[in-house]
């Protein structure tokens, strides 16, 4: 496993888990620092000791062979694997040259020793200095916080206000130092991948020049040397892009940290001081607490952020009630009492501020929970995958291929933003009919046209390859076997919504044509992947982990461009159909719970957005036109339309494949609390509707009770968490494939279809 990413949002929570992750990075930096010192020492011995050259080589080679790179993330790219393997390759080369005793090269000190010493002092040393500053500020902040918490509420309001201001200033300063430290740690960990290996590569290249006996060995090494050089350059290029992204994210976090908090499974979490009664008096112990409103479960872990602080034993409380403490009833400020179901005594807790106490009270007193207040990462744009959208992309592609296919830096050189917006406004003008495929006037520069194409794709409400399948595409790129990557991506492409797949086909055919002219325009498949990866697979949440996955986004786009004919012209070998999978699940349901892969995917489209989408796309096909124009008609006509669509799909095998893997784009959107008027997806106890079923014979879904066969933990706010044996009320098929809707403890939510049986 690689090193875990350090999120900037965790600097504000400063949780025990964050401290543990930070400590693992610090240990890795210490190991790297010690290893570089040892490597420099060994290198000097190798240069100075001609008589002991063989012994020095063995030690040096042994040091290289023992060190293992640890990259950030749970998988490595081909370039990182190549770089990580390079030390073992170097050691093997030195082992083969062990018997050759020739004097050291004159410039080895400049080639090898100086860069490593420079990296150790300027990068690793700088990280240590920032660490000292971080530890010092952490100590000061915690000490001041404890002192502040002990202030009596009977003091004058002016003094209390002044103390609050001082604490807030200290806290902000601590957050800034913490952010800078995390940034520096990430930077050093990334830099060592090229600034550390590159001097070693240069040193070995110098050895080959002076060793006549190693000429043949050098020829054998040249292929790996070339591959490694490319990998180092690719890693360096990615580092430059990643660093700018991370710095930009850090600046956004600094300016408004509350808008960039990471999504959390907890309703509320943070530090609280808990009053503990002793034999002589009481004491206040700092705990990191988390609370889940659905289960009314509160978890407390004793922890102090001071250096060397140990994590205590976890304690779980099932909440019964939460009452605010009156100011006059206790000397401490910001206090409230918590009563547990399984605890005989009441716990008194102290929040860090009045605002913090209000948040805890709102989370625990039965009011509406305060979930993540982040703004949507992507506001609804005017761009859509409708006739206008396809027309705009086709016009841009036609202009590029007829006028600028050989321009150097195509798609990499950006146009002037004002010109780009002007061209997009012109192309998106509703007065211009989308059926009119007029060419873009020659007055528009190619870089303006290419920037407009990229901007339009970024303006879509979601990325072209969808948020739903983003993690699946990334996982496919992380597969070790290239054939497996291609096969998995091929399947995922055919699971995309039809319009997304059509647009992706149009774009990839064009990019393959651009790559075919790379000798003139210098835009290779790799360069196009760098340009379009973040656009086609943009993350739903802007985090450090998402930035680290950019390299895999690029790999996905490269694979699609290189294999675009196979990706879009052939249908992949799809897994079992929905009905077969349903039957197999029913057979195995008595023996074991469904695996994670059997858990259906949810789309989480809101009624509002779907209606807007259907309205905009109503001109695309006669079937969609029928659906949108009759959305408010009776249940009879609605079911007739559904039956007609089933008959239409039965005549087209391609549509059958699409239907088995994604929801029907024509499905209506009933309210969350009312059953659908058309049985698009049947309950487990009823047979799956076939394409030949007429509207008259289509049964209307009747809400029933269902019992959970297995426990399930919700992965989204719209899902329900439950244990085995739980009984649900008012259960009926959902518009989401593989899901049911039901009511549990007064809350309506989604339930996996293969996790329950009807009563």
UniProtKB/Swiss-Prot annotation:
Which regions are flagged for Basic and acidic residues bias? 608-617
Annotated region described as Disordered, given as residue ranges: 578-701
One Gene Ontology cellular component annotation held by this UniProt entry: cytoskeleton
The UniProt record lists the keyword Membrane: yes
Alphabetical list of SMART domains matching this protein: PH, RhoGAP, SH3
Domain SH3 residue range list: 701-759
Record localization:
Cell junction, Focal adhesion; Cytoplasm, Cytoskeleton; Endosome membrane
**UniProt keyword annotation of Protein biosynthesis present:** no
UniProt xrefs under InterPro entries: AH/BAR_dom_sf (IPR027267), BAR_dom (IPR004148), GRAF_BAR (IPR035483), GRAF_fam (IPR047234), GRAF_SH3 (IPR035481), PH-like_dom_sf (IPR011993), PH_domain (IPR001849), PH_GRAF (IPR047225)
Site for Arginine finger, residues: 412
**What residue stretches are annotated with the PH domain?**
265-369
Q: Which residues form the Rho-GAP domain?
A: 383-568
SUPFAM superfamilies recorded for this chain?
A: BAR/IMD domain-like, GTPase activation domain, GAP, PH domain-like, SH3-domain
Keywords attached to this Swiss-Prot or TrEMBL record, sorted alphabetically, are: Cell junction, Cytoplasm, Cytoskeleton, Endosome, GTPase activation, Membrane, SH3 domain
Question: What residues does the BAR domain cover?
Answer: 7-262
Low complexity: compositionally biased ranges: 618-637, 679-701
Bias-annotated ranges (Polar residues)? 638-650
Among the GO biological process terms of this entry, one is: signal transduction
Please indicate which superkingdom the organism of origin belongs to: Eukaryota
List the GO molecular function terms.
GTPase activator activity
Physiological role:
GTPase-activating protein for rhoa and cdc42.
Please identify the protein, giving its name as recorded: Rho GTPase-activating protein 26
Please report the organism this UniProt entry assigns to the protein: Xenopus tropicalis
What is the organism lineage in this UniProt record?
Eukaryota, Metazoa, Chordata, Craniata, Vertebrata
């Amino acid at each position: 496993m690689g090193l875990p990413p350090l999120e900037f949002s965790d600097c504000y929570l400063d949780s025990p888990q964050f401290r543990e992750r930070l400590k693992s990075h610090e240990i890795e930096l210490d190991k790297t620092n010690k290893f570089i010192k040892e490597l420099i020492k060994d290198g000097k011995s190798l240069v100075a000791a001609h008589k002991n050259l063989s012994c020095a080589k063995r030690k040096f080679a042994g040091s290289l062979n023992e060190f293992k790179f640890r990259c950030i993330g749970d998988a490595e790219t081909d370039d990182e694997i190549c770089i990580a393997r390079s030390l073992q390759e170097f050691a093997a080369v030195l082992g083969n040259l062990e018997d050759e005793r020739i004097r050291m090269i004159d410039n080895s000190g400049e080639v090898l020793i100086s860069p490593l010493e420079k990296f150790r002092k300027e990068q690793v040393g700088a990280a240590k200095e920032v660490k000292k500053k971080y530890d010092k500020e952490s100590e000061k902040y915690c000490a001041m916080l404890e002192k502040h918490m002990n202030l009596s509420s009977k003091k004058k309001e002016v003094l209390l206000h002044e103390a609050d201001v001082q604490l807030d200033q200290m806290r902000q300063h601590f957050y800034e130092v913490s952010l800078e430290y995390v940034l520096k740690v990430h930077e050093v960990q990334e830099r060592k991948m090229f600034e550390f290996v590159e001097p070693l590569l240069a040193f070995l290249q110098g050895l080959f020049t002076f060793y006549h006996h190693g000429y043949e060995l050098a020829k054998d090494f040249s292929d790996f040397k070339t591959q490694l050089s490319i990998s180092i350059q690719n890693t360096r290029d990615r580092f430059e892009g990643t660093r700018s992204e991370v710095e930009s994210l850090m600046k956004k976090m600094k300016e408004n940290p509350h808008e960039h908090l990471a999504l959390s499974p907890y309703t509320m979490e943070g530090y609280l001081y808990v009053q503990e009664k002793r034999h002589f008096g009481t004491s206040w112990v700092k705990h990191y607490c988390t609370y889940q409103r659905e289960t009314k479960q509160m978890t407390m872990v004793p922890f102090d952020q001071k250096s060397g602080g140990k994590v205590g034993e976890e304690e779980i409380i099932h909440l019964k009630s939460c009452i605010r403490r009156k100011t006059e009833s206790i000397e401490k400020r910001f206090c409230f009492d918590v009563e547990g179901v399984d605890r005989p005594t009441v716990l008194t807790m102290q929040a860090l501020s009045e605002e913090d106490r209000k948040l805890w009270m709102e989370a625990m007193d039965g009011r509406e929970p305060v979930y993540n207040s982040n703004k949507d990462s992507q506001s609804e744009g005017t761009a859509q995958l409708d006739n206008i959208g396809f027309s705009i992309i086709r016009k841009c592609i036609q202009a590029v291929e007829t006028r600028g296919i050989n321009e150097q830096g195509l798609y990499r050189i950006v146009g002037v933003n004002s010109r780009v917006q002007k061209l997009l406004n012109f192309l998106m003008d509703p007065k211009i009919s989308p059926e009119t495929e007029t060419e873009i006037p020659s007055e528009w520069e190619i870089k303006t046209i290419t920037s407009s194409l990229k901007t339009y794709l970024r303006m879509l409400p979601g990325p072209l390859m969808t948020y739903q399948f983003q993690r699946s595409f990334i996982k496919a790129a992380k597969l070790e076997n290239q054939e497996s990557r291609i096969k998995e991506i091929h399947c995922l492409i055919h699971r995309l919504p039809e319009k997304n797949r059509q647009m992706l086909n149009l774009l990839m055919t064009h990019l393959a044509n651009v790559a075919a002219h790379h000798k003139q325009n210098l835009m290779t498949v790799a360069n196009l992947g760098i340009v379009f990866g973040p656009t086609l697979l943009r993350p739903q949440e802007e985090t450090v982990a998402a930035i680290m996955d950019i390299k895999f986004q690029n790999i996905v786009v490269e694979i699609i461009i290189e294999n675009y004919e196979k990706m879009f012209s052939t249908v992949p070998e799809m897994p079992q159909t929905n009905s077969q999978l349903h039957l197999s699940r029913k057979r195995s349901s008595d023996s074991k719970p469904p695996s994670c892969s059997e858990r259906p995917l949810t789309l989480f489209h809101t009624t509002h957005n779907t209606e807007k989408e259907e309205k905009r796309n109503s001109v695309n096909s006669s079937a969609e036109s029928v659906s949108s124009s009759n959305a408010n008609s009776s249940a009879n006509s609605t079911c007739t339309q559904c039956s007609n669509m089933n008959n239409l799909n039965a005549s087209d095998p391609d549509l059958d494949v699409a239907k088995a893997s994604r929801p029907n784009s024509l499905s209506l959107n009933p309210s969350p609390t009312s059953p659908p008027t058309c049985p698009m997806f049947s309950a487990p106890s009823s047979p799956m509707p076939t394409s030949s079923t007429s509207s008259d014979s289509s049964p209307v879904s009747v809400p029933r009770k269902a019992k959970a066969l297995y426990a399930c933990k919700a992965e989204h706010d719209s899902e329900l968490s439950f244990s085995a044996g739980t009984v649900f009320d008012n259960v009926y098929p959902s518009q989401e494939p593989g899901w049911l809707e039901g009511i549990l403890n007064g809350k309506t939510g989604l339930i996996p279809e293969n996790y329950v049986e009807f009563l």
